[in-house]
């Protein structure tokens, strides 16, 4: 992972505001270190995209979105894992990388009930809404944090 960190940070920056903005590669590393991180790479082992998964109850992960899913999980009496972010390099988009990352997550999450993800509605990220809906995610809630930031919460049965 340390060798890939610079490339993952570049992918993350190019994907903002669709994913959380980080001020530095070390800022991104902080979240990666708390997560399960899967990386898709090309034949030369250059990263094309990545997805990070956070276990509910990870208190070191300071995220109102994770806290929302923890409350939803408790209300629904279910087992869930949270997608912190999925990001694909601009030149690799439209080639199935994001779907391949999610398919890998579905495999390693066997035995879990749900996968949770949030998608921006303000600023809107219509491509991500379509992508998640196409993969079977259902909208289960929304939250407005500010006039410039609102999210939709999606879950998918695994």
Residue ranges and their predicted role:
Residues 88, 94-107, 130, 134:
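Conserved acetyl-CoA-binding loop-helix of GNAT-fold acetyltransferases
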